[in-house]
Amino acid sequence: MDLTELLAFVVKNKASDLHLSSGLPPMIRVHGDVRRINVPAMEHKEVHGMIYDIMNDGQRKFYEENLECDFSFAVPNLARFRVNAFVQQRGAAAVMRTIPSKILSLEDLKCPKIFAEIADQPRGIVLVTGPTGSGKSTTLAAMVNHKNETEQGHILTIEDPIEFVHESKKCLINQREVGPHTLSFSNALRSALREDPDVILVGEMRDLETIRLALSGAETGHLVFGTLHTSSAAKTIDRIVDVFPAAEKEMIRAMISESIRAIISQTLLKTKDGTGRVAAHEIMIGTPAIRNLIRENKVAQMYSAIQTGRQLGMQTLDQNLQEMVARNLISSAEARGKAMNKDNFAGG
């Protein structure tokens, strides 16, 4: 099997990832589980050749010098793939994550109605958080697409690498990739504020400078979308504040409290019928009460504010999980694995 055939097999089987690892057969991740493909083990030379075929000269050089490399590429009429190539004990290896060529809408994803209202905000910061592989990019792409279909403005994305490719519909869209188009998130963000954007998407808020610039962008009248690898709204606020030195923490809390519009923390769970995965969300909206808690460093009280803010569109992860169990979408055991309070999901 050549790489194109393998990737076609991946897409056909609705797999999220293809794993190539010297000395082993290719493997795919389907609905969260890694499975072997029934083909012979691949030698180092074969895996190395496959990886090199889809790299450009700059990426090959980077891979040789750093022993790992992130990039994305497309197979025409199939899909785009986000790739991490690396070296392991048996030789060359790579993981290819499928990025569907069609951007799903908020309706396609069965997102809560409040997501469209969040995307409609004219300014502020909206964070989508969760572990790797929890569908953050897919949710954000749907929110950007909503903006693109309903408003006339300039959307600027800064990604590493570019995942979903957006067409300019009602909006002008410019997508920049760290590496080929800009040297860093912080460089691109600094320039972004002079590029007349209405919306800025920051693929990953990974360091102090990027976080500071994203907050400044939100403060100066732009809508900023960003992602973090945190599992709840409270942990997200703590994670942002913790990046800054003690002397700045109070100022950063004030900045977040002014600009935060929503934090959506999501996780994927296997459906009860075993045919796929479904997202569960904690949703925090930047209400006056929430902003106050952030400003006063009472983040621990945020959970109960979210719990009691249902009429405002808020929900805790456990509330969402309970609904999904009641609707027979997921099993109690699956919900218990992700729940904050496991006792709510006794039995199986």
What are these regions (language model features)?
Residues M1-G348:
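Short, flexible helix-loop junctions that flank or precede catalytic/ligand sites
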